[in-house]
Every structure is written in structure tokens, then in C-alpha cells.
UniProtKB/Swiss-Prot annotation:
The UniProt record lists the keyword Mitochondrion: no
Protein name stated in the entry: Kynurenine formamidase
Organism the protein comes from: Bordetella pertussis (strain Tohama I / ATCC BAA-589 / NCTC 13251)
Protein residues bound to substrate: F18
UniProt remark on cofactor binding: Binds 2 zinc ions per subunit.
Tagged with keyword Manganese: no
Cofactors (names): Zn(2+)
Record's catalysed reaction(s): N-formyl-L-kynurenine + H2O = L-kynurenine + formate + H(+)
Pathway: Amino-acid degradation; L-tryptophan degradation via kynurenine pathway; L-kynurenine from L-tryptophan: step 2/2
Functional note: Catalyzes the hydrolysis of N-formyl-L-kynurenine to L-kynurenine, the second step in the kynurenine pathway of tryptophan degradation.
NCBIfam families named among the record's database cross-references: trp_arylform
Amino acid sequence: MKRLWDISPPVSADSPVFPGDTPYRQQWKWSLTPDCPVNVSEITLSPHIGAHADAPLHYENGAAAIGAVALEPFLGPCRVIHAIGCGPLILPEHLAHAQAGLPPRVLVRTARHAALQWWVDDFSAYAPQTIEWLAGRGVTLIGIDTPSIDPASSKTLDSHHAIRRHDMRVLENLRLDDVDEGDYELIALPLALVQADASPVRAVLRELA
């Protein structure tokens, strides 16, 4: 059996969220008793918690919700590239060493250990010119091990609008701590949420050989 790497952080009430966004909450609506045959919970959360896929609706009014987005970009050959210690922005030169034969999906690891217990503002993000550089090499999906492809302080979301122009897809909040640089199969399908601006994903990598 081919090896799997789970690259989705655990989701719980302790999961960090963007300041002001909705945290994970869970309460039990039904409990297993002699009069009730099941446990059933109610969950409230932002669709941007944990590993998730943004929809075009997230950064453009009237654009496609996540349930209308094609699934093909979220499944297939993928390259993990290490840019550990790259600083606030991932630049093309941080990825150039791994550009030969680039597959359509690229995930970038920026940290030795993803921040899973608390929110941090100074995470690494993609420079817009890096989106252009990747799009020019046929990349259709990008991912990152931080909460956003844009800096936390950004009000213009330049990298999000760069992927909009190129009709690219994005995965954020991945956990790549245990993943070596190299090629894998990505499986990270979003839910068919017909009105949502994003969806949680259970993202995994599978070895190719």
C-alpha cells in the first residue's frame, strides 16, 4: 500500500482563526440514552478554519461558490517545495531550485513547524509575482502551510487577485511539517457547499511509487 501523509491540522475549539472570524464550537443536541439511539452534535465554524480551499467568491463578489468549483485541481500530481525561513514573502527565487518539470500543483512549506495552537500575524505569504511565475509554468493550484497566501495585514489581497486572474485554486493552513521536498499525489477535495466562500478539506499526500 502506498504511504499517506495527512497534511490537515486537527480542528477543535483550540484551532486558531483569523482575528474576528468564527472559531470552532460544538454542542451535543442529542445524547445516547435508553430513549435516544444516537449521539448528534451541532458544529459552528468558519469555513477557513484548519486546512481549507478558498472559492473565488471569497475575493470577488458574484464569483463561484466552492460547491461550483471543479474538483480536478484538488486531485493529482503535486510538488512540495521547501522555502523554510523565506521571510514575509515567498519569492520566485525561493522556488526556482525545484522548478524543473513542475506539476500543476505546488505546495510550499515555509516553517519547520506550522502554528497550530495560536494565531500568529507574521506568517509567510506568496508575493504576487510568485503567483505570476507559477501560473506561467502551468501551475493551477497552490498551497501553503500558513493561514493565507496574502499577509495578515493586507487590505488588497494582491495574491488572491492574482490567482483570480489566472483561475487558479488555493489551499491554505496545510501542515507540511513531516513532508520532504518532492513529488506526490495530492487529494484535498472541498465539500459541495453551494453558497460558501470556502470549504474545509481533509488534505493528504500519497506517494507516487
